[in-house]
Amino acid sequence: MKKRILAWGAASLLLASSLAACGPKATTETEKKAESGKASEAASEKAEGAFEDEALKADLKLYTYPIGKWGDSASVDSLLQNFNAKYPDIHVTVEYLDYQSGDDQVNTAIEGNAAPDLIMEGPERLVANWGAKGLMVDLADLFEDDAAKDIYPNVVEACKSSEGKYYEYPLAMIAHCMAINKTAFENADALQYLDLDNHTWTTENFFKAVKALHDKGQENVVAVYCGGQGGDQGTRALVNNLYGGKFTNKEHTEYAVDSSENAQALEELVKAEGINFDPALVGGDEITLFRNGTLAMSLCWNSAQQNNKDNGEAGKTNNGDEIIPMLFPAKDGKAELCGGIWGFGIFDNGDENKVKAAKAFIRFMANDAEQAKLSVQTTGFFPVHKDLTDVYEGTENAETMKLFTEKFMPSFGDYYQVTPGWATARTEWWNMLQRIGQGGDVKTELTTFQTNANAAAKA
């Protein structure tokens, strides 16, 4: 059995716009007056609609998962102040969820006919879970707004169900990655295995680095954390990228984990000294151990973690070692990163007035030119609007965000989290890793995962 690490605490893309141009034509005075009248009428209707929108009155409840500072009440209060300056009669109360018990809280509220009006998370929950159950409002009209025309097509597709209904309106996106402790790598002469210009490495060099670090005395180099679903995008990306395995088919209709590529990856991880499967850890715990020097690498990283200053200087461990973000190792050095998309959904609580107010909230937070920048900044991630540029210009995080934009976001991979049965598949994944870490046969456990996950996908 692989040795268990003691956890010290938890911490927790593209399109071109088409423009149609019409040549000028001669018009009569009558035509001009008619056109002018239509324009005035349209402007009047638009102004009236805007007035009615801003005059909405409603009490809304928003549930939000800890998406960057959207999990911080002071930060969200500031955003709500901006919203209430325009919509003084829409009152939004917020309940802050975590990734350990958040799903249970939402499901309990649904069962008690007390679902929130608004919820902020990703398509795997809003589209593939609650949307697929018919609990969410179709937001197709929001995507018909001019303000939605520059959202990356792959993001739009991720927000749409297999029936063609849109259950999420996106705000921000990220490509998750891993990170290494530069000092630990220097001491073990392991920097030679990294392409630091591109932040990439090969599978072969990854295992060479692990060996070098372990031989130098780093007992715990990498933790394959499997105590729950928190941060599981890291373990999925590691296993899939090592030898080119997949998690689902391209159509997102079934799971495809049971493959020779994934089996080889897991077998090599089990064998490697310094890589430990730990059923006591989830992603947040692993980050804590990486920051305090217990681990030399983290599988649960992104730009928000790189910018985090909770325990000291951004981009440094607790004792000041430099943290270098890296793509996951791949056989050819070309990894596909698991992506995250976050936005808003509306539960169908049968109150049309609340739905209108909730849509006004979404439009303001995600589409308003100035507010959207602040909303995205609060996530610590990247805008889904192609034309929403310079979000971090002039901020202390500008350099880091530029690095991630150039080196990591182009590797945003397939967004397979919308595959049916996703909630079950996530649970099956960490349970499978636990059994493998405890000595279970890799091939047998992969087959068990795929059987159970695909049964859920077809249910």
Predicted stretch roles:
Residues 4-9, 16, 22-128, 147-148, ...:
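Conserved N-terminal structural module of periplasmic/extracytoplasmic solute-binding proteins
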Residues 43-54, 122-177, 320-329, 393-396, ...:
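Hinge/lid segment of periplasmic solute-binding proteins
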Residues 53, 138-151, 195-199, 222-225, ...:
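Short, solvent-exposed loop/beta-turn-alpha elements that line the ligand-binding surface or hinge
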Residues 82, 86-151, 165, 187-189, ...:
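Extracytoplasmic "Venus flytrap"/periplasmic binding protein-like
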Residues 85, 91, 267, 271-275, ...:
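Extracytoplasmic/periplasmic substrate-recognition and gating elements
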Residues 207-212, 251-283:
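Glycine-centered hinge/linker elements that transmit conformational signals in sensory
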Residues 323-327, 376-431, 435:
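Long, aromatic- and glycine/proline-rich binding clefts that accommodate carbohydrate-like moieties
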